[in-house]
Amino acid sequence: RRCYDQIYMSAAYAGLPVHVLGSDAGVTAAFNGGTHMPLEDAAMYLSIPETVVLDPADYAQLECITRQLPGITSGVTYTRFVRKGIVKVYEDGSEFPIGKGVVLHESDKDVATIITSGIMVDESLKAYEALQAEGISVRVIDMFTWKPLDEELVIKAAKETGAIVTAENHNVTCGLGSVVSNCLAKNCPTVQEFVGVQDLFGQVGPQDFLMDEYGLRAANIVAAVKKAISRK
């Protein structure tokens, strides 16, 4: 927060290729407490013109992203990530072009789409399994690039499944859900539900406690999917 003016004026406005990495994103700040819990970090960077905002799910994705950063020769990039307790989602050496979402599950029977990123990818995959067990087929997309958004993939999912649920380790105001909602409003108005921190300040506590407290669990995603489907 304190360096925002420098990032905006000295880097972004000047058109310099500055790559910012922010660790302990969202509730993973845990015992750092409310004053040091970045629930709005991506929102600040999303609002700066010509930025790239990234939220990788695991080390393999982070490594691939990092290798691509030198190729971005103007403007600010912001990568938010986690330092500890990361669940492995992808195989080492996997490729993830910046600006393209990753479809993790897809079928012609999908009745909703979960769009997620970061630590919420693991929770979304758990939600997928729970919904499958109930006979509810959903699409799951890892949208690790928040900006520029893969609008083509979002629109395709919206048209084919008719309901969208976004799941993020961030405030739902001005985060991934808002970016997706803007895309849908412009191109393909679609029912959407938002899983994330609901306009609240951070607090101190273990990550597991915080994920329960802020509704960032697979069960919350399952409930949001069912609500979205009921609104179609």
Language-model segments: which ranges?
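Conserved thiamine diphosphate
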Residues: 1-113, 229
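Thiamine diphosphate
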Residues: 29-30, 82-232
